[in-house]
């Protein structure tokens, strides 16, 4: 399958420009990634866009990711001199660490301000960046403690930018995520589709399910057996589709397996943790 998907709505090009304009107002950036696919959910231009602005990497949806793998990712980012935290904006895991980690990172800057005689330094100003559907709005709501940002499960739901107070110590600028103009890497697109970061209408659903099942077969075979009551996992991917389809009653007239329906079921099960905590990338 050839993948050169143009998925770069006009508001994203604008967001990139706006992020670079707003960096002048910002003390620190929170780079929000999906803990299950930290590299695939990362904008490849992020270093160029953010320059040397202080940054904390937040591995969101960590409660859905394989804990052992998430620990490896935290170590990976630390080796790159990037402080990383495992969080889950939906459940609240790790949220309290965010403000204290930012304070720690900015303490020298604010100490200098105090030394200059600024008695009541302003709140830290932070910017959250991330691709669509990685949980930016949910994180803002969690940090602000009230329902401000519009959240939804449809990618690209956040459009406008706004400042939001987080207690007395921080102000947050919410900005729509930035996704690269095209996926050079086919696997990146498939991972984003598997986790629901891009709309199901963008890629062929069966292609995504084939990718996901091949991955699960290799890395989480016992979960597959348990979820779909399989005695063993067939070698051929079509046979695996057939086995799941028969177990789940996904049949069309004449008794053939409905592969689209099987694809929907498998992807829904992945996204709703019916197969447990999964990570689709390791460092």
UniProtKB/Swiss-Prot annotation:
<dbReference type="GO" id="GO:0003924">
    <property type="term" value="F:GTPase activity"/>
</dbReference>
<keyword id="KW-0690">Ribosome biogenesis</keyword>
<comment type="similarity">
    <text>Belongs to the TRAFAC class YlqF/YawG GTPase family. MTG1 subfamily.</text>
</comment>
<feature type="binding site">
    <location>
        <begin position="60"/>
        <end position="63"/>
    </location>
    <ligand>
        <name>GTP</name>
    </ligand>
</feature>
<protein>
    <recommendedName>
        <fullName>Ribosome biogenesis GTPase A</fullName>
    </recommendedName>
</protein>
<keyword id="KW-0963">Cytoplasm</keyword>
<feature type="binding site">
    <location>
        <position position="177"/>
    </location>
    <ligand>
        <name>GTP</name>
    </ligand>
</feature>
<keyword id="KW-0378">Hydrolase</keyword>
<dbReference type="GO" id="GO:0003723">
    <property type="term" value="F:RNA binding"/>
</dbReference>
<dbReference type="InterPro" id="IPR016478">
    <property type="entry name" value="GTPase_MTG1"/>
</dbReference>
<keyword id="KW-0342">GTP-binding</keyword>
<dbReference type="InterPro" id="IPR006073">
    <property type="entry name" value="GTP-bd"/>
</dbReference>
<feature type="domain" description="CP-type G">
    <location>
        <begin position="16"/>
        <end position="181"/>
    </location>
</feature>
<dbReference type="InterPro" id="IPR027417">
    <property type="entry name" value="P-loop_NTPase"/>
</dbReference>
<keyword id="KW-0547">Nucleotide-binding</keyword>
<dbReference type="InterPro" id="IPR019991">
    <property type="entry name" value="GTP-bd_ribosome_bgen"/>
</dbReference>
<dbReference type="GO" id="GO:0006412">
    <property type="term" value="P:translation"/>
</dbReference>
<dbReference type="GO" id="GO:0042254">
    <property type="term" value="P:ribosome biogenesis"/>
</dbReference>
<dbReference type="GO" id="GO:0005737">
    <property type="term" value="C:cytoplasm"/>
</dbReference>
<dbReference type="GO" id="GO:0005525">
    <property type="term" value="F:GTP binding"/>
</dbReference>
<keyword id="KW-0694">RNA-binding</keyword>
<dbReference type="InterPro" id="IPR030378">
    <property type="entry name" value="G_CP_dom"/>
</dbReference>
<dbReference type="InterPro" id="IPR023179">
    <property type="entry name" value="GTP-bd_ortho_bundle_sf"/>
</dbReference>
<feature type="binding site">
    <location>
        <begin position="133"/>
        <end position="138"/>
    </location>
    <ligand>
        <name>GTP</name>
    </ligand>
</feature>
<comment type="function">
    <text>Required for a late step of 50S ribosomal subunit assembly. Has GTPase activity. Binds to the 23S rRNA.</text>
</comment>
<dbReference type="Pfam" id="PF01926">
    <property type="entry name" value="MMR_HSR1"/>
</dbReference>
């Amino acid at each position: 399958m050839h993948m050169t998907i143009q998925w770069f709505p006009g508001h994203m090009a604008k967001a990139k420009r706006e992020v670079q304009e707003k960096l002048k107002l910002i003390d620190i950036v929170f780079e929000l990634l999906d803990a299950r696919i930290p590299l695939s959910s990362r904008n490849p231009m992020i270093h160029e866009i953010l320059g040397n602005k202080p940054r904390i990497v937040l591995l969101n949806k960590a409660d859905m990711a394989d804990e052992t793998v998430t620990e490896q990712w935290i170590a990976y980012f630390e080796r790159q001199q990037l402080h990383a935290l495992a969080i889950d904006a939906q459940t609240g895991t790790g949220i309290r660490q965010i403000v204290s980690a930012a304070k720690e990172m900015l303490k020298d800057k604010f100490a200098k301000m105090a030394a200059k005689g600024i008695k009541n330094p302003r709140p830290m100003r932070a910017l959250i960046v991330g691709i669509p559907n990685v949980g930016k709005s949910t994180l803002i709501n969690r940090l602000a403690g009230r329902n401000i940002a519009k959240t939804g499960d449809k990618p690209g739901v956040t459009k406008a930018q706004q400042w939001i107070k987080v207690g007395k110590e921080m102000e947050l600028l919410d900005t729509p995520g930035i996704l690269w103009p095209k996926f050079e890497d086919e696997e990146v697109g498939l991972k984003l589709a598997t986790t629901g970061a891009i709309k199901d209408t963008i890629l062929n659903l069966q292609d995504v399910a084939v990718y996901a099942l091949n991955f699960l077969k290799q890395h989480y075979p016992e979960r597959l057996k348990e979820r779909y009551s399989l005695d063993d996992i067939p070698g051929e991917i079509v046979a695996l589709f057939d086995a799941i389809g028969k177990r789940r009653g996904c049949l069309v007239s004449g008794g053939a397996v409905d592969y689209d329906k099987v694809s929907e079921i498998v992807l829904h099960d992945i996204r709703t943790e019916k197969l447990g905590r999964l990570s689709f990338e390791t460092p």
